[in-house]
Amino acid sequence: MKKITIIAVSKNRNINNIEEAIRSGINNFGENYLQESLIKIENLKKYKNITWHFIGKIQSNKTKKIAQNFSWCQTVDREKIAVLLNKFRPKNLPPINVLIQINNLKELQNNRYIDQYQELAQLILSMPNLNLRGIMAVPSIKTNVIENNLQYEKIKTIFNRFKRQYSSVDTLSLGTSVDIKESLLATSNMVRIGRNIFNI
């Protein structure tokens, strides 16, 4: 039975909310907003077994703080961000775990778009302070079942291709509170859950 990692999406949650989740056994937290997350990371340093994932949109001017404070960055979608994360990752920390965010699901059947992601993967693999772990995607929820299933099949296909090509790839971050079933069928092994964990 495969292991599923649950990321508690803790944006807009306070320190007490997160501590309650920690006491319930959650130890992976996903943050979208950098300034908010830095306050939480600082105040929760006493918990040595928790892991912080950055899951928000990345701007270039935020890469330094992300590289310094997070164990995972799930939203790397272009070369510039990878280069800056590698540059700013402190030498006394292990390489930051990186997921490539797949943005344009409509175009995944076009080899040109797949090639772009593979070029980004090759760049990340060449950088000593980055550890390529897989891909992350956020499908749009379609009312048309066929269209909906096709998105997940596309993501599964590119993930399997990455796994065959790159030995470090082992993570597909796919799935939220609204599409867990579809995501697990697409072989996701990391899901991002917010309301269903914090219940507020």
From Swiss-Prot:
It comes from the Bacteria. Keywords: Pyridoxal phosphate. Pfam families: Ala_racemase_N (PF01168). InterPro entries: Ala_racemase_N, PLP-binding_barrel, PyrdxlP_homeostasis. The modification N6-(pyridoxal phosphate)lysine is found at K11. The keyword Lyase does not apply. Belongs to the pyridoxal phosphate-binding protein YggS/PROSC family. Pyridoxal 5'-phosphate (PLP)-binding protein, which is involved in PLP homeostasis. This is Pyridoxal phosphate homeostasis protein. It comes from Buchnera aphidicola subsp. Acyrthosiphon pisum (strain APS) (Acyrthosiphon pisum symbiotic bacterium).
